[in-house]
């Protein structure tokens, strides 16, 4: 009888863990802003999706051995999953993520879309270029230059560090 009860409890626990929602986007941002205040940093808020190839490239570049310590010294990188499809909606998407993206003018931007915020949540910059087009994951020399300029404006990165980031992001042509 005890074994039967144990199996039932385990089954129910497994069921709920499989159907658990991701964390609310506003709570994610709230935690990041709190951490940014404590550490005297800005927040790099990145909206992405599991199906988005450019999002994966952006994450890979930001997490490369050369770039990650530079970004982490100046920002709290924060990811919010939006625009998931099918079964991935429940599996990956953060509730209220799209509303948060819309709040920062990213409704029609495409992915990835990112915003640089100060520790109070004020927008310092975003992924729109001078022509109001989303850079997304910068890859061309022009896009990466614009990204570098935004980093320079919102961080204490040195010219040498900014060049390291530029070199890691610029798309190499074979």
Where are these regions (language model features)?
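Thiol-based oxidoreductase modules, predominantly thioredoxin-like and allied folds used
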Residues: 23-26, 67-95
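Non-catalytic, surface beta->alpha helical segment in thiol-disulfide oxidoreductase systems
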Residues: 102-161
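Short active-site neighborhood of thiol/selenol oxidoreductases, capturing the structured segment around
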Residues: 39-53, 77
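Typically the conserved alpha-helix immediately C-terminal to a functionally engaged Cys/Sec
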Residues: 55-72
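Bacterial Sec-dependent N-terminal signal peptides
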Residues: 1-23
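Extracellular/periplasmic catalytic domains that process cell-envelope and extracellular macromolecules
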Residues: 37-38, 69-72, 106-110
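C-type cytochrome heme c attachment motif
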Residues: 50-57, 112-115
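A short beta-strand-turn-helix
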Residues: 25-43
